[in-house]
Design a protein with these regions (language model features):
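Short beta-alpha junction loops
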Residues: 72-78, 111-116, 246-248
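Hydrophobic, often amphipathic alpha-helical segments used for membrane interaction and targeting
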Residues: 80-235, 255
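N- or domain-start disorder-to-order transition segments that initiate the globular core
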Residues: 1-31
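Membrane-embedded segments
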Residues: 45-63
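Beta-strand elements within well-structured catalytic alpha/beta cores of enzymes
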Residues: 35-37, 68, 72, 239-244
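C-terminal structured interaction module
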Residues: 239-270
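Acidic/histidine-rich helix-loop elements
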Residues: 32-51
Length: 270
């Protein structure tokens, strides 16, 4: 795989594409399906019908072979969970992990740990900025949820998660830090009701502040980890069903499709 083909954000920002965004490759009995989703947690959203159609198609093409699901984020479902419940809690990732479990296909999350990613981000950004990015990114996800905890409870759990993962000494892991950084960057108080503005803050395709730069660096780190995972399983003979956000799908497409050209080159060389 030629990872240099990963599309840069400057180039990506000039592109227009559908959501969801889907493509596939097939070679020598292996299949790779990439479903680039719109981040939604409403089971009635039409993308989930399309996702189920593509999943059934994938199962038919790969019956009897080695397969794996590659998904975004953290998902924790049990045997009592329904598809609708999985979507309401985890969106498209919950849907594909649920369907994978029903088909007895293993799912994997290929991303670096929070600490590993943060250590790389610290080369260019402050702890305040990185913590703010992580918490506000979580707030945006919370705002998209149809079924959600009370905000104070969500924030408490999210802050606890990052405090345990980051292990920073002498750092104020609190929402007061988020409010302070927000005021410093934007010159105004944090307003939970200003949803449109908040949604842009951790979005890598915007240029509102340095936090968007963190988002871009984070996304690039994650993209490389995803490509490494896909390449590894492909070389081991697995068929792969990937479900990630549409931007990841679009940006990774040239690199993923280079798997095919490399196989052709290898056959010619042999």
């Amino acid at each position: 795989m030629d990872k240099n083909l990963l599309i840069a954000f400057k180039e990506y920002s000039a592109l227009k594409h559908k959501q969801p965004y889907f493509y596939s490759i097939e070679s020598s009995g292996q299949v790779l399906y990439y479903f680039g989703a719109e981040h939604k947690k409403d089971p009635r959203h039409p993308q989930f019908e399309l996702l189920q159609e593509k999943w059934k198609e994938f199962l038919q093409k790969t019956f009897g072979g080695k397969s794996i699901v590659v998904f975004e984020g953290s998902v924790n479902i049990n045997k009592e969970t329904t598809l609708d419940e999985a979507i309401q809690k985890y969106g498209e990732s919950g849907a594909i992990v649920f369907m994978g479990e029903k088909a007895h296909i293993v799912s994997t999350r290929p991303e670096p740990t929070i600490k590993d990613e943060a250590d790389r981000l610290l080369r260019e950004f402050s702890r305040d900025e990185i913590f703010y990015f992580y918490i506000v990114r979580g707030v945006v996800s919370w705002q998209r949820s149809l079924v959600r905890k009370e905000f104070d409870e969500f924030v408490r759990q999210n802050i606890k998660r990052y405090k345990e993962a980051l292990e920073w000494s002498d750092f104020d892991f609190s929402f007061e830090t988020v409010k302070k950084v927000h005021q410093q960057i934007f010159g105004k108080k944090f307003d939970l009701d200003d949803r449109d503005f908040i949604s842009k803050i951790p979005n890598p395709t915007y240029d509102e502040s340095r936090i968007n730069e963190i988002a871009r660096m984070s996304s690039t780190i994650r993209n490389m980890a995803i490509l490494d995972c896909i390449e590894s399983y492909w070389q081991k003979g697995y068929s792969i069903f990937v479900v990630y956000g549409a931007s990841h799908a679009v940006m990774q497409e040239p690199a993923i499709k280079s798997l095919m050209s490399q196989e052709v080159s290898a056959k010619i060389a042999s």
